[in-house]
From Swiss-Prot:
Species of origin: Mus musculus (Mouse)
Complexes and interactors: Interacts (via C-terminus) with ARRB2 following LCFAs stimulation.
UniProt name for this protein: Free fatty acid receptor 4
PTM notes: Phosphorylated at two clusters of Ser and Thr residues located in the intracellular C-terminus, a prerequisite for FFAR4 internalization via an ARRB2-dependent pathway.
Membrane-spanning intervals of the chain: 46-66, 78-98, 104-124, 157-177, 205-225, 269-289, 296-316
Length: 361
């Protein structure tokens, strides 16, 4: 008996035959049939629009936040959020290439890195939102006790932890994504696809449960608890906080309004994240279940549109943030571009008001 026959029929590991006959999920590879051109144009238009809006929005938001004279922990975390969004949407051109070619022609290196970078940046986003909510709660407690905020070293350590943990948590995807030949439904021959190839089901289940719990459910719980605590503190001690601040009455009102506006903006960012990331988390879990139930069918086109919906969150974040906190800056840019004379007047009257923003606390 040849070694090959012995490998498939002998008393070897039980998962060897399963791996040979296993059908892998093709992710972005798909055979679209007769409507390939129309579908590809629609997909390109949608993702192209998301990419442009995300790129312009996040870059503008980065510039507006970075130009602040004083930047505290919240500002650093918000900058980190925009950087993660830019990294996440950087995968869009590669996704579009695969949607046009159908087969994976980008090579094994890109296959290893594409889903790794997307997963890592998504993890950075949710952890950053959790850190922002926690920092806001701590900031209010410190304000009541007259304590200063975290220093630059603490902020740098927090950002390093977020990126380091996210990189390690997503590392199995970098290792286990590989290019394999497979015949897709609607195709007449095998084509190369980039897919996730776990050595065994136990490892796949363990990682899925670990990642969803620690990178989605736990940060979500932290966000809910933090914002609930913020609301509780705000309602219970709003009058006492206003009376105890060592500022003029008008300045107290301004800071309170800005703090409420920042809280509302960050809350909207959190809500939009969970709404727009929950479908992809559910889809990934369904792909795992598909390994055990062959009657459960998940089409690559469905996966693509779920990912496109998730990409849209990176375009929505800077829009929500800019519209809520940088209305004056955008009015100034608009006036300076179209009405230079009014823009100069608006600039002079808005400098002091901009410097009072709570984001620098």
């Amino acid at each position: 008996m040849s070694p090959e026959c012995a490998q498939t029929t002998g008393p070897g590991p039980s998962h060897t035959l399963d791996q040979v006959n296993r059908t892998h999920f093709p992710f972005f590879s798909d055979v679209k049939g007769d409507h390939r051109l129309v579908l590809s144009v629609v997909e390109t238009t949608v993702l192209g629009l998301i990419f442009v809006v995300s790129l312009l929005g996040n870059v503008c938001a980065l510039v507006l936040v970075a130009r602040r004279r004083r930047r505290g922990a919240t500002a650093s975390l918000v900058l980190n959020l925009f950087c993660a969004d830019l990294l996440f949407t950087s995968a869009i051109p590669l996704v579009l290439v695969v949607r046009w070619t159908e087969a994976w022609l980008l090579g094994p290196v890109v296959c290893h890195l594409l889903f790794y970078v997307m997963t890592m940046s998504g993890s950075v986003t949710i952890l950053t939102l959790a850190a922002v909510s926690l920092e806001r709660m701590v900031c209010i407690v410190r304000l009541r006790r007259g304590l200063s905020g975290p220093g630059r070293r603490t902020q740098a350590a927090l950002l390093a932890f977020i990126w380091g943990y996210s990189a390690l948590a997503a590392l199995p995807l970098c290792i286990l994504f590989r290019v394999v030949p497979q015949r897709l439904p609607g195709g007449d021959q095998e084509i190369p696809i980039c897919t996730l190839d776990w050595p065994n089901r136990i490892g796949e289940i363990s990682w899925d449960v670990f990642f969803v719990t620690l990178n989605f459910l736990v940060p979500g719980l932290v966000i809910v608890i933090s914002y609930s605590k913020i609301l509780q503190i705000t309602k219970a001690s709003r009058k006492r906080l206003t009376l105890s601040l060592a500022y003029s009455e008008s300045h107290q009102i301004r800071v309170s309004q800005q703090d409420y506006r920042l809280f509302r903006t960050l809350f909207l960012l959190m809500v939009s994240f969970f709404i727009m990331w929950s479908p992809i988390i559910i889809t990934i879990l369904l792909i795992l279940i598909q390994n055990f139930r062959q009657d459960l069918v998940i089409w690559p086109s469905l996966f693509f549109w779920v990912v496109a919906f998730t990409f849209a969150n990176s375009a929505l974040n800077p829009i929500l943030y800019n519209m809520s906190l940088f209305r004056n800056e955008w009015r100034k840019i608009f006036c300076c571009f179209f009405f230079p004379e009014k823009g100069a007047i608006f600039t002079d009257t808005s400098v002091r008001r901009n410097d009072l923003s709570v984001i620098s606390s």
